[in-house]
């Protein structure tokens, strides 16, 4: 982790430990990346994103390489963190189940906004159905 050089080594370590604790990995602090599972590596990435207390976290397929159980855990952790830290999350995903947990879903087709859903105005099941229809329409999945 990189910090401004005006921050002491002790303070940097304290922030790193705190971030790892927040994602449940303080006990794995001295492990190498190849000694961590995919879910643990994603949680380390989340911890790194929290170090400077950002107002926005950008996540590109944060659960893309994870099994469904690990994906759920990572998404619950992200939701908890953004709520606790008053942070916003902008996420790219192809997983409709994850997309329907958002407050807002923006569908892109060929790099252009196709639809913009606010989930407080529309039920999550309706959004899931619309996303399934879109996937069928653009050929990502069989109809």
Residue spans for each PLM region:
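Hydrophobic anchor residue at the start of the ABC signature
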Residues: 46
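Conserved ABC ATPase signature
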Residues: 32-36, 40-42
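Conserved catalytic motifs of ABC-family nucleotide-binding domains
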Residues: 53
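Catalytic Walker B motif of ABC-type/P-loop ATPase nucleotide-binding domains
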Residues: 57-60
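ABC-type ATPase nucleotide-binding domains, specifically the catalytic core motifs of the NBD
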Residues: 1-11, 22
């Amino acid at each position: 982790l990189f910090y401004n050089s005006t921050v002491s080594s002790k303070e940097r370590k304290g922030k790193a430990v705190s971030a790892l604790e927040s994602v449940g990995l303080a006990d794995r602090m001295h492990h190498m990346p190849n000694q961590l599972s995919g879910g643990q590596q994603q949680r380390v990435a989340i911890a790194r994103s929290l170090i400077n207390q950002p107002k926005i976290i950008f996540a590109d397929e944060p659960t893309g390489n994870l099994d469904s159980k690990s994906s759920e855990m990572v998404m619950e952790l992200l939701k908890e963190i953004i709520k606790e830290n008053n942070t916003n999350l902008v996420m790219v995903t192809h997983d409709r189940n994850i997309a329907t947990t958002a407050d807002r879903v923006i569908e892109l087709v060929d790099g252009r906004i196709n639809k913009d859903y606010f989930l407080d105005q529309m039920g999550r099941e309706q959004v899931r159905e619309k996303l399934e229809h879109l996937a069928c329409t653009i050929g990502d999945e069989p109809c």
